[in-house]
Regions:
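Secondary-structure boundary/capping motif
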Residues: 18-21, 52, 77
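Structural motif
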Residues: 47-58
């Protein structure tokens, strides 16, 4: 008998833990995963701390088939999730051409500049 694939969600952010921001992504993700037969088995919330993010990523990826993250992927210096994911899996991180193209198209459409800070969002492990 086969079981459904499992997933975990790692929610990242001091603003979540302090109550300043309410996470709305878990509810949406759980519903969408259920529709396709994937069981969301655990949700963990950690602070904007690189060691906490890296450790949680390693622990969750060892226990579940897929790990989704929410938070810390913006254009500011404190958005460190991508770097922590790279560290958790011991892989290199750099700007990916397809991600750069998506961001360039978006910012061109909105009439805003794709600056270095925004280009950080195209960095993928």
């Amino acid at each position: 008998m086969s079981s459904n694939p499992t997933a975990a969600m790692l929610v990242i952010g001091d603003e979540i833990l302090s109550g300043r921001t309410r996470d709305a992504n878990m509810y949406y993700l759980a519903g969408e995963l259920t529709k396709v037969g994937i069981s969301l088995a655990e949700v963990r919330v950690v602070s904007d701390d690189s060691d906490a993010i890296t450790a949680a990523t390693r622990a969750l990826s060892a226990a579940y088939d897929t790990v989704f993250t929410s938070g810390g992927i913006g254009p500011t210096h404190d958005d460190i999730t991508a770097d922590c994911i790279a560290r958790a899996f011991n892989v290199h991180i750099d700007v990916r051409d397809d991600a750069r193209a998506l961001l360039a198209a978006y910012y061109e459409q909105t009439g805003r500049e794709l600056n270095d800070a925004r280009l950080r969002m195209a960095r993928i492990p």
